[in-house]
Amino acid sequence: MQVKATAKYMRVSPQKVRKVADAVKGKPVEAGLNVLQFMPQKSAAMIAKVIRSAVANAEVGGVDVDDLVIKGVIADQGPTLKRFRARAQGRGARILKRTSHITVVLEQ
């Protein structure tokens, strides 16, 4: 049985999330959370939160939590916030603040 959890509009770029996500794919839930706990990246805490949410979803569904494995962590692009930075001689530079939709799929 598959269990999903999603976090939307997270303020980190999908490219950075994917680098951390590759470290936990295919691992049991406890091992994956342990790996994420010691990673310095901002997205590691975000992914850990979504994994814990998926485990809670599994408990509600009556699935044995000890047997769950992280089947996949998907980081999709969310909407981009566009900001402006003033530059020299009246110019402006666009700053793109990217967001992510993080989906975790657990499998028994």
Swiss-Prot record:
GO biological process: translation
UniProt-recorded Gene Ontology molecular function terms: rRNA binding; structural constituent of ribosome
CDD domains in UniProt: Ribosomal_L22
One Gene Ontology cellular component annotation held by this UniProt entry: cytosolic large ribosomal subunit
Regions that span the bilayer: none
InterPro entries according to UniProt: Ribosomal_uL22, Ribosomal_uL22_bac/chlpt-type, Ribosomal_uL22_bac/org-type, Ribosomal_uL22_CS, Ribosomal_uL22_sf
Any Pfam family the entry gives: Ribosomal_L22
Alphabetical UniProt keywords: Ribonucleoprotein, Ribosomal protein, RNA-binding, rRNA-binding
Main function: This protein binds specifically to 23S rRNA; its binding is stimulated by other ribosomal proteins, e.g. L4, L17, and L20. It is important during the early stages of 50S assembly. It makes multiple contacts with different domains of the 23S rRNA in the assembled 50S subunit and ribosome.
Family to which the UniProt record says this protein belongs: Belongs to the universal ribosomal protein uL22 family.
HAMAP family linked: Ribosomal_uL22_B
NCBIfam families per the UniProt record, alphabetical: rplV_bact
Subunit comment: Part of the 50S ribosomal subunit.
Listed name of the protein: Large ribosomal subunit protein uL22
Organism (species): Desulfatibacillum aliphaticivorans
Gene behind this protein: rplV
